[in-house]
């Protein structure tokens, strides 16, 4: 667990990756339990951002007007990732689906190995009233942050993931390959790419 991970978050124009688009990708590199690098880019979406989404994320059409295209932003993000295992909160149901849709539209191959901290938190911290990232952040007594911006969310999740790694070590899980079995149950926290 002392390797490098890329903790990331996305913001989008809506909830369905089939018809909605990325508006921001934020990420941090976690090395040996510390956040060491940051990445953030707006993305010019394939449709206007609604006032409801602007209200939620603070991202306006003006902010993304001159942003990189989806393909350019995704390439820059994948260059930053550089083959590291991805870590995201609710990644399986949301962020990975959006990245896959963007990759497909852009003709970019994208089959990552990733860890979903939502599933991980459900296994590690049973009994929380919900498993939103902010709830876990508060449960772990970490500093508050501005939610619904990819740069802030990924940095906060990086700090959360560092605590989770320490908690995993206390459970005698010392390698990424042992996360699923080490946490028990039938939850698949680590999703490996299929060859």
For each of these PLM feature ranges, what is it?
Residues 72, 121, 154-155:
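Short secondary-structure boundary/hinge segments and terminal tails
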Residues 109-121:
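Conserved beta-strand -> loop -> alpha-helix junction used to position metal-binding or nucleic-acid-contacting
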């Amino acid at each position: 667990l002392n390797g490098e991970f890329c903790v990331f978050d996305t913001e989008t124009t809506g909830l369905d990756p089939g018809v909605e688009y990325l508006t921001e990708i934020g990420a941090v590199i976690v090395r040996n339990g510390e956040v060491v690098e940051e990445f953030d880019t707006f993305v010019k979406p394939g449709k206007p951002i609604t006032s409801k989404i602007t209200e939620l994320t603070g991202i306006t059409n003006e902010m993304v007007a001159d942003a990189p295209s989806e393909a350019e932003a995704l390439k820059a993000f994948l260059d930053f990732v550089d083959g590291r295992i991805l870590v995201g909160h609710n990644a399986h149901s949301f962020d990975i689906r959006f990245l896959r849709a963007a990759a497909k539209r852009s003709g970019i191959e994208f089959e990552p190995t990733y860890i979903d901290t939502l599933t991980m938190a459900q296994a590690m911290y049973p009994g929380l009233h919900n498993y939103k990232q902010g709830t876990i952040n508060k449960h772990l007594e970490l500093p508050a942050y501005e939610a619904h911006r990819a740069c802030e969310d990924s940095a906060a999740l990086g700090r959360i993931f560092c605590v989770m790694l320490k908690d995993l070590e206390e459970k005698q899980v010392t390698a990424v390959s042992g996360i699923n079995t080490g946490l028990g149950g039938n939850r698949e926290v680590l999703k490996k790419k299929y060859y």
